[in-house]
Curated annotation (Swiss-Prot):
Belongs to the ycf36 family. Its main location: plastid. It comes from the Eukaryota. The keyword Phosphoprotein does not apply. Keywords: Chloroplast, Plastid. It is found in: Plastid, Chloroplast. PANTHER family: PROTEIN CONSERVED IN THE GREEN LINEAGE AND DIATOMS 27, CHLOROPLASTIC, PTHR34214. GO terms for cellular component: chloroplast. InterPro entries: CGLD27-like (IPR009631). This is Uncharacterized protein ycf36.
Length: 155
């Protein structure tokens, strides 16, 4: 039995599209490559903000401001990526998919057959869930660091 839901709306295809997108693919890196990429991104943002703040005025604590801004951006990037993968994770786990087309069958629901369901749940549990865990840890660490930097800035 073929799936009546359009190919681009199948959760597995949405997952494949998300992992190949340049702004989400970094989260799929494995182990040390993931953390190296995050550190490189943090360093590039830090240097960018240092240069920008130096052009504005030299009375600011450029290093601290740059670190706060780069950490804030990393938190926002992690949060955006987490929300994207979370959406896919929830769709992979669902046993029924709503149609998202604007035609006569809009709003109806297609129940996945057992083959689709097993395949989707395996991808969700063994591929997407570890990505979500890493993103959650990265966000927590960066957000904690951001709070410490803001406290240092205030006091």
């Amino acid at each position: 039995m073929n799936c009546p839901v359009p190919e681009n709306q199948l959760p597995i295809n949405e997952y494949n599209k998300l992992t190949s997108a340049w702004d989400f693919s970094w989260a799929c890196k494995i182990g040390k490559l993931y953390y190296k990429f995050l550190l490189k991104m943090q360093l590039c943002l830090f240097l960018f903000f240092c240069i920008c703040l130096n052009f504005l005025d030299s009375k600011y604590e450029t290093g601290l401001y740059s670190l706060i801004l780069s950490t804030l951006f990393i938190c926002l990037i992690c949060l955006r990526t987490y929300l994207g993968f979370r959406y896919i994770y929830v769709r992979l786990l669902k046993s029924a998919l709503p149609y998202e087309e604007s035609s006569w069958y809009d709003g109806q629901v297609w129940v996945k057959n057992i083959n689709y369901l097993i395949k989707d749940r395996l991808v969700a549990d063994y591929t997407v869930l570890p990505i979500l865990s890493r993103l959650k840890i990265s966000f927590t660490i960066n957000f904690s660091f951001l709070i410490c930097l803001l406290l240092r800035f205030i006091f």
